[in-house]
Amino acid sequence: MAYAAFRSIGAYVPSKILSNEDLSKMVDTTDEWITKRTGIKERHIAADGEFTSDMGAKAAQIAIERSGIEKNKIDMIVCATISPDYFCMPSTATIISTKLGLENVTAFDISAACTGFVYILSIAKAFIESGMKKNVLIIGAEKLSSITDYTDRGTCILFGDGAGAAIISATDDKSEAIIDIHTGADGEFADLLMSPNGGSGSIHDTLDQEAKSCFMQMKGNETFKVAVKTLTKDVIEILQDNNIESSEIKHFVPHQANLRIIKAVGDALKLNDEQVVLTVEKFGNTSGASIPMAINDIYESGKLKAGELMLLDAFGGGLTWGSALVPFSPLK
């Protein structure tokens, strides 16, 4: 039987920084107000003319180079994004495939908001274990600045741009394998986080209303309560299902939405500060890109070593959620 191994990680962060001080000149807010409520100090913003596919391709190129796997051996690309280059078609994954010079690969996008990376990790695992694919490139890429209302202080303080990518490949060695992935969704809470843009559910009569509805909308307090409850329940279940103690987790890599949410879940699991990966302060919430960007951060800082166990955990619009137990298994 083939198993799926997490081989490499890469990320791309735009150079432009939007600080809390910058935002205080745009909306009624302060650095203190933002930091106290979110833990965010700054976020990165894509340059004019820089698209989601550009960022995704740059992150992917790094992941490919680090993997030790020949580029032409990649047989599938899956991109998680809620800010694609084009909302209808083509998919961002197909555009990325061309930018990477890859031909005849399966390529498609999925939309699971901030849980996107866990979802595409589960897709890669399933395709590899079925024997249908051998080397899958998964990408979380977001240009959230393109769907952020910079007159709404409740959302514009949260979001940033960036991309992260990983190579998942087949292995015969079970010790290298992704251990387990949980995913779920509940549409009952769909209105907590949404971007009611021009889909078939649109009810707007004018183009101005339609354009405004493309921006992300969030019910912050309700989302916080549901997120903490759902994330805590999910990570406890995946640990119990696999007879793994929280002390065995080397790196807890949650979706970087809000420092208070992350700390609440970490406290529920009795994790120490060294186990919890935090990048929300410098990147903000980058939705489907946040987990791979956080993994890349600990990789580049030398904290992530071969064989170490990561617990990934995410929650997003839909509502969606997911968790994964993932050993870091670079090719020897």
Curated annotation (Swiss-Prot):
Where mainly found? cytoplasm
Q: State where the protein is found.
A: Cytoplasm
Q: Any idea which residues are catalytic in this one?
A: C114, H255, N285
Kindly state a single biological-process term from the GO annotations of this entry. secondary metabolite biosynthetic process
Renumbered residue ranges of the record's region ACP-binding: 256-260
Q: Which GO terms describe its cellular component?
A: cytoplasm
Q: Which GO molecular function entries does the Swiss-Prot or TrEMBL record give?
A: 3-oxoacyl-[acyl-carrier-protein] synthase activity; beta-ketoacyl-acyl-carrier-protein synthase III activity
The reaction(s) catalysed by this protein are: malonyl-[ACP] + acetyl-CoA + H(+) = 3-oxobutanoyl-[ACP] + CO2 + CoA
Q: Does the keyword Transcription apply?
A: no
In short, the EC number is 2.3.1.180
Keywords, A to Z, come to: Acyltransferase, Cytoplasm, Fatty acid biosynthesis, Fatty acid metabolism, Lipid biosynthesis, Lipid metabolism, Multifunctional enzyme, Transferase
The pathway this protein participates in, as annotated, is: Lipid metabolism; fatty acid biosynthesis
| NCBIfam families in the cross-refs | fabH (TIGR00747), PRK09352.1 (NF006829)
Domain annotation text? Answer: The last Arg residue of the ACP-binding site is essential for the weak association between ACP/AcpP and FabH.
Subunit structure, briefly? Homodimer.
Task: Outline what the protein does.
Answer: Catalyzes the condensation reaction of fatty acid synthesis by the addition to an acyl acceptor of two carbons from malonyl-ACP. Catalyzes the first condensation reaction which initiates fatty acid synthesis and may therefore play a role in governing the total rate of fatty acid production. Possesses both acetoacetyl-ACP synthase and acetyl transacylase activities. Its substrate specificity determines the biosynthesis of branched-chain and/or straight-chain of fatty acids.
Q: Which family does it belong to?
A: Belongs to the thiolase-like superfamily. FabH family.
Q: What is this protein called?
A: Beta-ketoacyl-[acyl-carrier-protein] synthase III
Gene this chain is encoded by: fabH
